[in-house]
Amino acid sequence: MRVAIVGAGLAGLATAIDLADAGCEVQIFESRPFVGGKVGSWIDGDGNHVEMGLHVFFGCYYQLFELMNKVGAFSHLRLKEHTHTFVNKGGRTGALDFRFFTGAPFNGLKAFFTTSQLSLQDKLQNAIALGTSPIVRGLVDFEGAMKTIRNLDKISFADWFRSHGGSNGSIKRMWNPIAYALGFIDCENISARCMLTIFQFFAVRSEASVLRMLEGSPDEYLHQPILRYLEARGTKVYTRRQVREIKYAEAEGQTRVTGIVVAKGDEVEEITADAYVCACDIPGIQRVLPQEWRKWSEFDNIYKLDAVPVATVQMRFDGWVTELQDENKRKQLKEAAGLDNLLYTADADFSCFADLALTSPSDYYRQGQGSLLQLVLTPGDPFIKESNEAIAQHVLKQVYELFPSSRELNMTWYSVVKLAQSLYREAPGMDVYRPNQKTPIANFFLAGSYTQQDYIDSMEGATVSGRRAAKVILDNIKK
C-alpha cells in the first residue's frame, strides 16, 4: 500500500514508522528545509544550533519513548533531578521536589506540602483544591477519573481551581508558569481538562513527572535516528516540498482523494497514493483543506480552532548565569556550572527556560564560552512585531533581575525565533472541535497533536496522534 504523508513533524514521522513497519510504501512531503515541525532545529551560518522551542521529555511520554527506543534515540535523553525548580526575582528559588522514599501519589503530596514557592495559606488551599479533584478518584479508577476530567473542558483551570478552594496566590506563583510552559497560555485561558489531565498522570505514576532533555539538538539526537530508521525501510522524505492542493473526486456517493499537488520551487507534480495523511499544525491544515469539504462538520470544526504565538530566545554568555552560589565558578570558563534542569519563573515574560550548555551539552556547550540560555516568551503576542534586538535586550534585563549575580556577565550572542501560530490553543470548550484521525473521506486521514488524543499539544500528543492515524489506515485500507 502506498501512503503519502503531508508534514514531517513528529506526528507525520510517527505515522510513517508504524506504516513502514507494516510494509507500506511511504512518502513524506515537508515544506520546510528540515524535519521535526515544532520540534525542529537547524544550524545557522555560524554553526549555532537554533531551536524552535524548549523541548522537555516528561516521564509519561510513553509512546514517544517507545518510538525513540525503536529507532535507537532513547539513549540520547539525559535524566534530570526529580525536582521542578522555580526561579524568582533576586535569585530566590522555590521547588516542587518529588524526590521521596516512596512513589505516587505520596511523592507529589510531599512536593506540594514542602514547596517554598507558596505561602502556608496557599499550600493549604492548594491541598483542598487538589484533594477534591478527580485526581483522587484516579488513584483507584483511572479511566473513570479521565472521563470526569474530559467533561471539565468547558471551564478554565483558574475557574475550576477557585471553585474548589484554590487561591489566586497559587495560580500566580505556581500554576501560571506551569500552564504557560504546557500550553503557552495562562490559567484563566487554559482548559481545566488540559491541566487536570497532566496532574492525573503525575498523581498516578511516579515516573510521569520525571524530566529528561536531549543530549543535544533535536535534529541530531531525535530526528536523524528516525530518518535513518525510515530510510532503511524504504520511506522517502522530501523537504522544501509544499503541498498546494488536495485533488478529489466523487463516485457512487463517496468522496476519495485522487492525488496531491506538490510544489518544488516553481515546478509542481501530482503525487498519487492509496491513502493520504495530513500531519499538519493548525494553520497548515486550515490552508490545505479543500473549502468544499467544510460541508462536513469534522472539517468545518477545524476552522474554529486557533493557535497561540510564541517567541523562543537563545542567549550565550561569557559566564554561568544560573550559578548562584560560587562567584569563581560563575566567572570561569573551564567547565559548566549552574542549574542543570528545566526552570520555571513567575517573575518574567518567559515562563520556562534552561541553560542548554548544562542540560544538553553535546551541541550547546562550547569550550571557552558560558551559558546558553533558551527562554520561551509566553504569551508571545506582544513580541511577534518587535525587532529581534529589542526582544533580546528585554529578555536580558529580566534575566539580570532573576539572577542579580549574573549582571557582571555579558551576552555574547543571541537568536530569536518567532512563531505567530504555534501550539493549538487549549482554551475552554475547544476540545469538541478537535477532529478524529479518521475522516469522512475514505482514504484521507489526519494526524497532529491538535487531533483527538488525551495529551496536550506536545511531543507525546503528536506521537499518539500519528500512531492512531497509522492504525486507522491499516485497519481500514490495508486489509
UniProtKB/Swiss-Prot annotation:
Any one GO MF annotation of this record: 9,9'-di-cis-zeta-carotene desaturase activity
BP GO terms, sorted: carotenoid biosynthetic process
Protein name, per record: Zeta-carotene desaturase
Catalytic activity field: 9,9'-di-cis-zeta-carotene + 2 a quinone = 7,7',9,9'-tetra-cis-lycopene + 2 a quinol
The protein's role, per its UniProt record: Catalyzes the conversion of zeta-carotene to lycopene via the intermediary of neurosporene.
Family stated for the protein in its record: Belongs to the zeta carotene desaturase family.
Root EC class: oxidoreductase
EC number: 1.3.5.6
Covalent S-S links between cysteines: none
Cofactor(s) the protein requires to work: NAD(+); NADP(+); FAD
Keywords for the protein's UniProt record, in alphabetical order: Carotenoid biosynthesis, FAD, Flavoprotein, NAD, Oxidoreductase
Pathway: Carotenoid biosynthesis; lycopene biosynthesis
